[in-house]
Design a protein with these regions (language model features):
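Metal-dependent DNA phosphodiester-chemistry modules and their immediately adjacent helices/loops
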Residues: 2-34, 145-157, 201, 205-292
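Short glycine-rich phosphate-binding loop at a beta-alpha junction
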Residues: 182-193, 198-199
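Acidic, low-complexity intrinsically disordered tails
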Residues: 291-302
């Protein structure tokens, strides 16, 4: 009606929205998009929703779309580094023989391969042990391209290197088996796309491999859980530099209507494979520890 596509003189379209460049945290801006603010639109509710968007950047797009009628990109920078830094301390317990879940994200041509293990601790926090691999022959090239110190990280023990200029999957397989012998690994999530052979080999080695596709259905709930743990300080990672770099890189994409989110490799500025692996590990933990519905019995009278 507004654009003249449909002619209906009984219909008056009025669209109230905040200007695209307006400060979405300014209450005066809220009034421009909500002319009935304080009457049918509750001001305290909007304040609480705005505070949520400030604390959790992934919610900013939804707040601006739903309450300010702004057109925004569906992806947004995700994790705040001051929140992430709450997990920088050393691991408080001995992890040997401890129960954990893991996610494995295999590298494409330029990515890192990442295995991330998630350990639930007795105090309700979660320790993360990440492992990363790149090929040794192009490490200098990767440093120049990504502008991060891969060689230094390797010398410090934060990054594995495989021989050659592509990932050596035989070495990767040996490394993963050696890592997993130290713990009680309950599941390793792996997207079956382009990884079927290694997944079958690792399963043949006795590792508990599980298919974990990287769509909204699988990734949204654990992504939200990760965000919650980061904000609340429950995610402990020891300040691992590679994982921290990738946490700073990650952006999410969202189907705003349903409220689903997931990390987006396409929208992120640099590598995020460790975060994707961590989300998969959280997803397996959620599935394994979800309460089983109590069985109920119905009485049938004949």
């Amino acid at each position: 009606v507004r654009d003249g596509v449909i002619k209906d003189e009984t219909f008056l379209p009025l669209i109230f929205s905040a200007p695209p460049d307006a400060d979405w945290k300014d209450e005066a801006v809220w009034a421009r998009a909500n002319p009935n603010l304080g009457v049918s639109v509750n001001l305290e509710f909007l304040r609480s929703e705005c505070a949520r968007a400030v604390e959790m950047p992934a919610y900013e797009s939804a707040f601006r779309q739903l309450y300010l009628n702004q057109w925004v990109e569906v992806e947004t920078r995700w994790l705040r580094m001051d929140h992430w830094a709450q997990g920088n301390g050393a691991c408080p317990v001995d992890l040997a023989g401890r129960e954990c879940w893991a996610g494995l994200d295999l590298a494409t041509t330029f990515d890192t391969t990442a295995l991330v293990l998630l350990f639930p601790l007795d105090d309700g926090t979660f320790w993360v042990e990440p492992h990363f691999w790149i090929p040794s022959d192009n490490a200098h090239q990767r440093e120049r391209r990504d502008k991060v110190p891969y060689l230094t990280w390797h010398r410090q023990g934060h990054l594995h290197m495989t021989d050659g200029n592509v990932t050596d999957f035989d070495q990767l397989r040996r490394d993963i088996n050696n890592i997993c012998t130290k713990y009680r690994v309950r599941g390793i999530g792996l997207d079956p796309w382009n990884a079927a052979q290694l997944g079958q080999q690792l399963q043949g080695d006795g590792l508990p491999m599980q298919h974990f596709r990287q769509g909204y259905a699988s990734m949204s709930a654990p992504s939200k859980q990760l965000e919650n743990w980061v904000v609340s300080g429950k995610l402990l990672h020891g300040g691992h530099p590679v994982l921290g770099w990738q946490a700073a890189n990650v952006a999410i994409q969202s189907d705003s209507a349903a409220g689903n989110i997931k990390p987006s490799k396409a929208k992120s500025t640099e590598r995020i494979d460790g975060i994707v692996s961590l989300v998969m590990a959280i997803g397996l933990w959620q599935t394994a520890t979800a309460p089983t519905p109590e069985q109920t019995w119905d009485l049938t009278v004949i």
